[in-house]
Amino acid sequence: MVWTLGLLLLLAGTAGADAPPRLLVVGDSLSAAYGIEARQGWVALLAQRLDGRAEVINASISGETSGGGAARLPDLLGQHAPDIVLLELGGNDGLRGLPPGQLRANLTRMIEASQAATAEVLLLGIDIPPNYGQAYRDAFTGVFHRLADDYDLLLVPFLLEGIALDSELMQSDGIHPNAAAQPLILDNVWPALEPLLSETWPTRTRNGEHE
């Protein structure tokens, strides 16, 4: 009986080690495919690119703030046990003019909770329109850089780099990227995400190769 139990535990551990990594995306409308079909969003395109080599869970909600994300994250971590957490929040904080210190506190909670759950964190930064004033804008964008430095995180400085100022890639509201922009968003994320995947992928799936 002891031998059988030990064998079962060994097999369970081996299966877990071979399981593909699990990615949890916690974001707002930029990651929730707002205004387009879900299958067109960059998170869905990420799942397609990974092609079963990782499980992608999209817990993004349009309109979400960093405070809402921080409140939801503990349950998400417990439910999904992710290996990598992609944090894409702050845009709605900025558009509402919320204090950058509040954004930093909320993202800090999320980073620390993710790391306590042994997940790697990828921080996806965002910018806000210049009409909010340069001082506020600098303080806002600086939050992402400081947190990346403080917690030694990989950072995508601006998720919509090369997209936000191109009207052909934005919806009519000028805030949300359209379907044509989604592959470009994924291309902005991929260089920072790939090193984390390389660390968590089982040997049999590294470099895109299957046994």
Residue ranges and their predicted role:
Residues 3, 15, 55, 204-207:
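Intrinsic disorder/low-complexity signature
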Residues 2-12:
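Bacterial N-terminal signal peptides
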Residues 12, 35, 183-184:
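Intrinsically disordered, low-complexity regions enriched in Ser/Pro/Gly/Gln/His and often acidic
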Residues 4, 33, 56, 60, ...:
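A general structural-boundary detector
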Residues 18, 45-48, 70-211:
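Alpha-helical cap/lid subdomain in secreted, periplasmic
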Residues 16-65, 72-81:
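Serine-esterase "nucleophile elbow" of acetyl-processing enzymes
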